[in-house]
Amino acid sequence: MKQVFGVFGDPVGHSLSPAMHNAAFSALGMDCIYHAFRVTPEKLEKAILGAEAMGFGGINLTVPLKEKALKLDFVKPDPLAKRIGAVNTLVFGKKGDIQGYNTDGPGAKQALLDTGVEIRGSRMVVAGAGGAARAVAFQLAADGADITVINRTEERAVGLAREISAADLPGKIRGTGLSGLKELLRDADVLINTTTLGMHPNTDATIVTAEELHSGLTVFDIVYNPLETRLLREARTSGAKTISGVLMLVYQGAEAFRLWTGVEPPLELMKKTVLEALQA
């Protein structure tokens, strides 16, 4: 009997996780299948307990369920997920325990390392102050980066930075509004966009243009649809190094795969599968 895995969210029909994980299971000869399940916040508790009762191998969670899942009494988050305040991966233990993890931060970290970014001491500008920004900023602060969180609503950026500072991590962090972005980027090593600006169908939107970027910068956009966002095009024009959101998607998925199975996933195949799905 096949072991079932899946992603819960609403909406969830657009998810590339089923294609990515099913390709990995097939390549490794594992008798497993991964589905997308539409689950609304009010049904989340029943859905998780139902999945555990039916013997699911594990679950991914996406918008709008990550924060709500952390608050469920029976979900036991690891320290990083607890700090971030959200879980995106659930692992069902043999004794009925349900462990919660957040693989978004590790996924972003691996994407940066793969591109040759030295995280410790790097001056990083993180655009956005939502759930993705929290996951990325907590991870990078834990790894010793010097971070400035920028957001249209300055209070949110300042609040997030204050919260991360209170965790007493090796990195430095501050928050600000958008007004000083040009000056910040002049001295920055990395710009990470964690907002939805530029995501399909609003593909002409961008947080900055080529004039505000420079060739010494690495620009990382976590948006992966379209494959090359306007921000990444602007970065390429300026001579900056670019990182596609596909890498973070694949690496966070690969980390979930390891947590569920204890098996090393076929990363190149997962990446190829996602790229083919986006180009279809």
UniProtKB/Swiss-Prot annotation:
NADP(+) binds at residues 128-132, 151-156, 222, 245. Shikimate binds at residues 15-17, 62, 88, 104, 224. GO terms for biological process: amino acid biosynthetic process; aromatic amino acid family biosynthetic process; chorismate biosynthetic process; shikimate metabolic process. The active site is at residue 66. Keywords: Amino-acid biosynthesis, Aromatic amino acid biosynthesis, NADP, Oxidoreductase. One of its GO terms (molecular function) is NADP binding. Belongs to the shikimate dehydrogenase family. This is Shikimate dehydrogenase (NADP(+)).
